[in-house]
């Protein structure tokens, strides 16, 4: 049986998921990168044969069951971290987005993480000090126009994190949410005004570092933390939304969103 710590990553073939996989692999963890992008998985496996890979459609519950059973067969049934990373974005106003794309964003970004939590629960519960990490976004702090379904889906991630943190408290599973602004991945190739005003400065390595930090709390106070910013601008946005009067926060968001 493998005695190293383990992490299962959805959407692990490219972008942030791939970077998280490499970060934890380099630290000696048993890493599972699962994705619907089989070509990306083949490339990852070719470059890093020790990373466990497999197909995962996050909108299909049976796919989750099969992928987790496959991965945990390498870990003795243990799972230290579930990284709910898979997500997609569509740009343009709601009236101009294809209905299928709108539905797909909700299915992957919302249903996907919920299925992941349900399927992984028994493995996380069976592992002392386990974590579930979900990939949120600063666009889940205040609604962002032109990427509205995506932004709304990240509000779901935020609320899901809060609720699951309470629901799983009895099982001693810690639940956290990573909330970056725009990251240098294909996901940022959208026509949102906020990408132009704020720029795309965060690297995938920065997000991977935040994921690592989130599952390694150093003290009691850090263990109470749920939301993790990645850069100063997204921290400022989160604090402004939390502590500013609603009209001020709205005006600030209007400036960002254009």
Which role does the model predict for each range below?
Residues 85-90:
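Conserved NAD(P)H cofactor-binding loop of Rossmann-fold oxidoreductase domains
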Residues 117, 153:
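Active-site helix of classical SDR
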Residues 177, 195-235:
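C-terminal helical subdomain
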Residues 1-32:
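Canonical Rossmann dinucleotide-binding motif of NAD(H)/NADP(H)-dependent dehydrogenases/reductases
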């Amino acid at each position: 049986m493998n005695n190293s710590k383990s992490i299962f990553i959805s959407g692990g073939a490219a972008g942030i998921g791939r970077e998280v996989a490499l970060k934890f692999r380099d630290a000696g963890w048993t890493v599972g990168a699962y994705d619907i992008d089989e070509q990306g998985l083949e490339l990852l496996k070719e470059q890093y044969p020790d990373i466990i890979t497999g197909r995962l459609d996050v909108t299909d519950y049976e796919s989750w069951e099969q992928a987790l059973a496959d991965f945990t067969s390498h870990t003795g049934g243990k799972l230290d971290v579930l990284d709910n990373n898979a997500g997609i974005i569509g740009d343009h106003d709601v009236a101009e987005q294809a209905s299928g794309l709108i539905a797909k964003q909700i299915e992957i970004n919302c249903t996907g993480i919920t299925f992941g939590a349900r399927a992984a629960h028994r493995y996380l519960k069976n592992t002392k000090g386990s974590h579930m990490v979900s990939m949120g976004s600063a666009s889940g702090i205040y609604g962002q126009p032109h990427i509205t379904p995506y932004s709304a889906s990240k509000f779901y991630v935020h609320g899901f994190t809060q609720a699951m943190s309470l629901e799983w408290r009895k099982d001693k599973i810690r639940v956290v949410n990573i909330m970056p602004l725009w990251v240098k991945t294909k996901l940022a190739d959208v026509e949102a005004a906020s990408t132009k005003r704020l720029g795309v400065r965060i690297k995938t390595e920065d997000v991977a570092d935040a994921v690592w930090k989130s599952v390694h709390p150093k003290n009691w106070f850090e263990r109470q933390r749920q939301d993790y910013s990645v850069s100063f601008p997204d921290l400022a946005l989160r604090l402004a939304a939390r502590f500013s009067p609603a009209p001020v926060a709205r005006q600030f968001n209007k400036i960002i969103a254009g």
